[in-house]
């Protein structure tokens, strides 16, 4: 009897897993790069213009938009839940406290412009996905086809911010966090290459520069000048070579033990991803190809489609019922 019950339980669990996978696959299949071609033909150019203007004023915004999209997708899927100004929501959780406020402002501003042209048509989730792509392009990086048709969540998911891997993560923890989202080791290393642009706060890397041994000594010393052992909010570039230009220098830094975050250097620390880092460091084309493919995969995580969710009229709050 115990064996029979166990078999039934296993079968039931398999049915649930398969059903969930099919549901996610079906939702992704409903996305299309031409989704707004008829309903809001000016949407893509409006987003691009808004991002280019913002990046021209502050280059860091390009990286901030990319990070915002990543944080959105890793929490319950790419549904703009991260944009909600809920006093107890995702924005209040530790992993999101260092998100650049300017990125939220840019998305909200673009949304207002899109709403003026096409009321109630383009979702905040899609605007953020496209803005992340355009931010990379504005900093000299590659473009990729963003599939569209996501809808916006009707709630925030603060408890699921634990899905975001912290900067203190080991390689094993990183691989597990990405695997949970059906992203493999190559995807993980490629998406980490987003750190070729942007900055991090001292509190995110103080442990690495004071406690770790797998860091270039001179590099660590230079960082300590503006980052005390106790931490703080002072900023340092994630890529010391070309901090405002998207490229593969991030991986070259890792080969020299100049990864800013503990989790960065874990990618090249006598582990299973060393060869991938070396490949990306030596071939910009290999990195670009892997990065764009991984961005498409990440952008398709758990989208709300059809009649699920809503098209928010303002990104930071839910529509009035």
Swiss-Prot record:
Protein name (record): Peroxidase 42
Disulfide bonds: 40-118, 73-78, 124-315, 202-227
Annotated GO CC locations: extracellular region
Record: active site: 71
EC number(s) from the headed UniProt entry: 1.11.1.7
Gene name of this polypeptide: PER42
Species classification: Eukaryota, Viridiplantae, Streptophyta, Embryophyta, Tracheophyta
Residues of the signal peptide: 1-29
GO molecular function: heme binding; lactoperoxidase activity; metal ion binding
Organism (species): Zea mays
Role, per record: Removal of H(2)O(2), oxidation of toxic reductants, biosynthesis and degradation of lignin, suberization, auxin catabolism, response to environmental stresses such as wounding, pathogen attack and oxidative stress. These functions might be dependent on each isozyme/isoform in each plant tissue.
